[in-house]
Amino acid sequence: MSVINGVKVKRNKLQFSRLTNLDGQYVREKIKSFLQEDGSEDDITTNYSVDTSIKMEAVLIAEEECVVAGLSILPHCFPKGIIIQSFIMDGDIGKPNEVLARIRGSARTILNRERVVLNLLQRLCGIATKTRQYVECTQNYNFKVLDTRKMTPGLRMFEKFAVAVGGGYNHRLDLSTAVLIKDNHIISAGGLEPAVKKIQDSKIGRAHV
């Protein structure tokens, strides 16, 4: 039991998790919406310049040293018939000019998806790399690197996944995960004490204050 600003609060030790795997169906649905946003099916440049019979091989190469994140979701970004070969695992260090993966199949399919897929992978690798830097700076201290809910709308689970791959921990996945009283709650509830009391009286068994 702790006293915060005169309010008695029972402290529960929070157990922070790591979202190191993304559900395949979730990824496919998100990628589908990203592709629709980009108009991939109506890619007039590719559709009018590349014959449907043309095959190609795309090579993913690291431009600089980074913590790789997102290769595990590549199979969910392309339809059947596209062959994906990864040479490194999520969480591993990619070296400059290192080949991370190869993608083989229909040139049209690969070309009308490449920008969406690359944008996502580059973002995830960037987050994982920056997280790893923070983790390495704090490895001699007794605390964990956590993310927040201040994430890109529509990309939350992907970005939390990247944090976990980089060695960090995930805080609240969403608003239903745990109680987190902030200034605006205190003001709206009429003070810290009534805010805490209302939550305690609600008997939310899974909530952490």
What are these regions (language model features)?
Residues 2-206:
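Acidic/glycine-rich phosphate/pyrophosphate-binding loops and surrounding catalytic core
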